[in-house]
């Protein structure tokens, strides 16, 4: 992957780091206050982090659109995306998610698996594999993996502080009533 240019911004779910290449937005990380995210640290160690010379205009547009999203003024991101770090299956599934599950909507892992089969590459994957792809999504929020839920609850989330962030995002988008408690009984 081409070296990334990084920008950061504050958000209601904590600090975010956005990485861009000349081809598009390639990474979005939830950051610990004052530090790098677990994924960012691991990928920088693998030679995928750093500061490159990607378009400052693209980085600025990504930060602006994320700020608009959190201000309730944007429901869909209109940014070029750099999929070069994704496998064919990841690209297919994440593209289907990006194109078919809108703001305020959810889909189950099984629903997304069925939609991916119907996509242009016709990738057939079990729901569990869809969950793994959601967990490795390089562009959370922009490619809205938080909108993919289990058939019997919220499922997991690897961004930020985990399931609390997913719950907050779904409530923010109106897909989950603020009073609904999805925690397992006895938790």
Label every model-predicted segment:
Residues 160-177:
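A short, Lys/Arg-enriched interface patch at domain edges and termini
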Residues 122, 156-162:
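Flexible, gly/pro- and Lys/Arg-enriched active-site loops
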Residues 117-132:
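Short, positively charged loop/turn segments that connect secondary-structure elements
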Residues 133-136, 140-143:
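Major-groove DNA-recognition helix of helix-turn-helix-type DNA-binding domains
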Residues 142-158:
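Charged low-complexity interaction tracts in eukaryotic proteins
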Residues 1-121, 172-187:
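Basic nucleic-acid-binding alpha-helical/helix-turn surface characteristic of O6-alkylguanine DNA
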């Amino acid at each position: 992957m081409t070296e990334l240019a990084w920008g950061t911004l504050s958000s209601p779910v904590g600090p975010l780091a956005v990485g861009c290449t000349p081809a598009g937005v390639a990474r979005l990380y939830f950051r610990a206050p004052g530090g790098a995210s677990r994924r960012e640290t691991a990928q920088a160690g693998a030679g995928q982090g750093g500061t490159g010379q990607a378009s400052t205009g693209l980085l600025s547009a990504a930060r602006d659109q994320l700020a608009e999203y959190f201000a309730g003024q944007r429901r869909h991101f209109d940014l070029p995306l750099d999929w070069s770090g994704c496998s064919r299956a990841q690209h297919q599934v994440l593209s289907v998610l990006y194109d078919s599950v809108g703001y305020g909507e959810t889909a189950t892992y099984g629903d997304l698996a069925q939609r991916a089969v119907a996509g242009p590459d016709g990738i057939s994957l079990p729901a569990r594999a869809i969950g793994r792809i959601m967990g490795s999504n390089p562009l959370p929020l922009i490619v809205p993996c938080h909108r993919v839920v289990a058939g019997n609850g919220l499922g997991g989330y690897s961004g930020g502080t985990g399931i609390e962030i997913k719950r907050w995002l779904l409530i923010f988008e109106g897909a989950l009533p603020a009073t609904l408690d999805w925690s397992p009984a006895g938790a």
